[in-house]
C-alpha cells in the first residue's frame, strides 16, 4: 500500500549539483500544459516506480500535441541518482536532467527546486501535478521534517501537507508556477477536507482517494490521456478509469485476488475530487451547521456517535480509527432539511465521487470493519476530522486533537466552542 503520512520517503543526503553535459537545454517554446509526476520512490515502493512509468508509456499516445508529461524519478537502486525524464508521445523515456547527488525529496525546499527545474525544462501555460508515493492525509507528527518514519523499513524524512502548501504557494508567489490546474494524489488517504482547504490557493482541483489505494496505484495506461482534459472531463475521466479498472476483478493480479478475495464482488477504490474554489464556502457552512446538530453538538468529553459510519484509516500504531466520511457524519448530525441545505454546498465543493465500502486494506482491523459500515448512509468519499477521546486522539505521538489544529480547516471549525482544547 502507498500508505501513511504524506510524505515523500527518501533516504539520502543533500542536493549538490549536476553535470551540464548530462542535461538538455531549456526549450524556448511554451507548451499548453505540462503534467509533473513527483515520484518519491527511494523507499519500499522503489520496485514499482518503473512499472508505473511503463504504464505511462503505454498511454503516451494520448498525450496531445503541445503538451508534456514529465516525471521526477527517485529510486533506491544501487548508485542511481534522482533524475527528471519526459514520457514522450512516442512512448520513450527521454532523460532531461540528472542530479549527481542524492537528496531528501521530502524536503520542501528540494520539492520546490525540482518543480522549478521542470518548469524551466518544459515551460507551459498550465501545470498539473501528480503526487506519487506514501501518504496519510492530514496526520502529522510535527510541522517540520519528521526525523522518523511512520511506514517502511528505513529511517527517512517526511513532508507534511502544510509544508507542501507553503512550498507551492512560494513558487506561485515567485511566478515560477501558476495556480495548478490539478493535483492528483496517487497515494493513500489524501482526500480529506483538511487537505483540500490547505491546498485551496495552489490548485483548482484535488483528486484522489480518502482510503488506502492498491500498491500498484493508478492504471496509468488509461489515466494518461485524461490528464490533459479540463473541468469535469478531467476529474471524471481520472476517477472513472481508476475506479472501473479495480472494479473489474479480471484486472487484479494473483496476489491481489488471494489477499483480498472480497474484491471479486465488484469493490474498488473510493475516489473523489475537491473543487477548491468552493472549499471556503463549505468550511463556513459546516461551521454553522455543527451548531444546528439535532439535539445540539455534544460538549467535551462527549463526541458524536460515529458507529457504522465508514472510516478510511485504521492506524495500527495507536489502534485508532480515524478519517470518517464527512458527508455521512453530517447526515447523521443534521435534520433532513438542514442536511439538504448543507449538501448543496458540499456538492459544489465535491462535485464527483465513486464510493466503495470495501477496498484493498493491508490492516486486518480495517478489513473487519467493512462489514459494519452502513450501506444506507450517504457517502461522499471525503473524510473530516472529529475530535474524540481515546488512544491516538488525546495522547501519544500523533495526538490528533492537537495536531489537527495545524490545519486551517479545523481552525475554522473552532472545536473549542464545544469544549475541546
Question: Where is each model-derived feature located?
Answer:
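Positively charged n-region of N-terminal signal peptides that target proteins for export
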Residues: 1-4, 19
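Terminal, contiguous helix-loop blocks that mediate binding/assembly
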Residues: 120, 144-185, 190-421
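Sec-dependent N-terminal signal peptides
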Residues: 4-13
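Active-site-surrounding "flap" and adjacent substrate/cofactor-binding loops of secreted or lumenal enzymes
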Residues: 46, 59-98
